[in-house]
Amino acid sequence: FNNLPTTAPLAPITARVRPEAQRGRFAVRRAVAALGYQETINFSFVEAHWEQDLAGNANPIKLLNPIASQMSMMRSSLLGSLLQVLKFNLDRKAPRVRVFELGRVYLRDDSVATTDSTVRGVHQPMRVAGLAWGDADESRWDGKSERIDFYDVKGDVEALLAPLVPSFEAAEHPALHPGRSARVLVDGKAVGFVGELHPRWRQKWDFAQAPVLFELDLDAVTARPVPVAQSVPKHQAVERDIAVVVAEAVTHDALMQTIRAATAAQGLLRDAMLFDIYRPQPLRDGAVAAPGALAQGEKSMAVRLSFQSDSTTLTDEQVEPAVRAIVEQLGAKLGGRLRG
């Protein structure tokens, strides 16, 4: 043994430089933690009924030799693990729970070949998911408390994806409330979902309050546009306020998309912000609405439009055609009209 030569192991060292348009996983962890969530680390093995109930996965990947009977499937969603963490905390009287996990899920995909980091037939994307339950704020100066709701967690998703600007569209998910859930899109591509737990699963898990959850593809969360320098505007912006009467079913997203599409060719619109919604009071029996008043089933949406040019100060003659184009498009696509 003493005659064996001392030879240091040799291995190539290759620097892995992350692209500037991508942030690391630890940066994502810090960002979610800064929103008030605590990280959890869970098994990738889950119960069989989680896959059916929460992920809608009719063909999950089954383990040949599970370590326990209740851990017989490879997860295709992180939600079941977070719900189990919530249940554990509530059984120990936790008053407020906000947790997240960053981990892999496992999906069948025949196009995946075997490599150093993949297994044939199994797609293993990374995802980040979060769950919030209890009061929206840990403590308030006035002593009042408000329960966490869909919009609180939706704001967390927007903050996590910033500076990218996601859009949200109503969608159904096996784990989520059909009327309080949405698909998350970035540049028109679906990257995840956010919503309140389905009442059926809330009752099954015996939660006094429905938690709000989100799950996003990690690639979408780590993507970052490279900053581009631009000059400070030299000319003052011009603002116009319009109040548009539309049907109750018209959404904020549909309104904003129509406004931006109407002025895309001109390139003068810098911002559009909804600042007020008015709905008429229900009429009493036998009462008649005043002439020109909003009908039942209608609402008024007030929007502040901001126009600006990089080369000159805008005049009324330049702004008014853009406003007219917006009003015409709102009438043609959404059936809207200016409020009298």
PLM regions with names:
Residues 47-153:
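Flexible beta->alpha loop and helix N-cap segments adjacent to enzyme active/binding sites
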Residues 20-28, 59-61, 109-120, 183-190, ...:
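Short, charged low-complexity intrinsically disordered segments located at boundaries
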Residues 37-38, 55, 114-115, 167-169, ...:
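Short secondary-structure boundary micro-motifs
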